[in-house]
Amino acid sequence: MVVAVEYISKEESSDVAEGAASVQHGVTGILAVQGAFAEHAAMLDRLGAPWKLLRAAEDFDDSIDRVILPGGESTTQGKLLRSTGLFEPIAEHIAAGKPVFGTCAGMILLAGRLDNDENVYFGALDAVVRRNAYGRQLGSFVATADFGSATGDFAVSVAPGERVPESAASESIVLKDFPLVFIRGPFVAEVGEQATVETSVNGNVVGLRQGNVLATAFHPELTDDTRIHELFLSL
């Protein structure tokens, strides 16, 4: 079971080592105090990318070169980030310009401001986010949209089932027809000049990128589509 695995490396798992050998990056730290961290780990397993669950400050070591903030309950996660001592090392990671990916609650944690909550966490995005914008659990839904801000003749389209090129970070990439799973998700109420809109649904912005910060209001980890995780690993 994925949830039982704390860390996968070349030394500890020869099965994963073959897939991980071609991945040109270190370990992805997945915040694991609450929420859908196991699903993100399963996605990285499929891509042969090593990961480590972050439950306490001592889990955040020099091997980690990128961080995932999973979906869940943002207020609870915010409190646990402080009590576990993980807030400071993750904040330093973000301030250093290293890659971070937030989904749903993770987008809230990365927001520069919330328009319906006085809390501010990492403040990494030049954007105002609205918590629980899509209402209660019964308001959850699935949509399909292209993901990526690239337009014109130089945009590289990646269709469902295709792999994102390893050079994606330096190319104009559009992920075609990506499945968007919303569970009481937020959306972006205001987008500042530094952030780039990656996708929208019904006029609401639900995907942003700002440098090495990637954030979605939806849950790509709850689908069978690995393309956004591939894009994140290319940052």
Predicted features along the sequence, with ranges:
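A secondary-structure boundary/capping signal
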Residues: 32-33, 103-105, 125, 184, ...
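Hydrophobic anchor at the start of a short beta-strand
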Residues: 51-52, 100, 213
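C-terminal and late-domain segments of enzyme folds
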Residues: 2-19, 140, 153, 160-179, ...
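Redox-cofactor binding/interface segments in oxidoreductases and associated redox assembly factors
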Residues: 68-69, 102, 216
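Cysteine-nucleophile active-site neighborhood
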Residues: 73-152
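N-terminal beta1-alpha1 cap of cysteine-dependent amidohydrolase-like domains
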Residues: 1-83, 88-92, 151, 158-166, ...
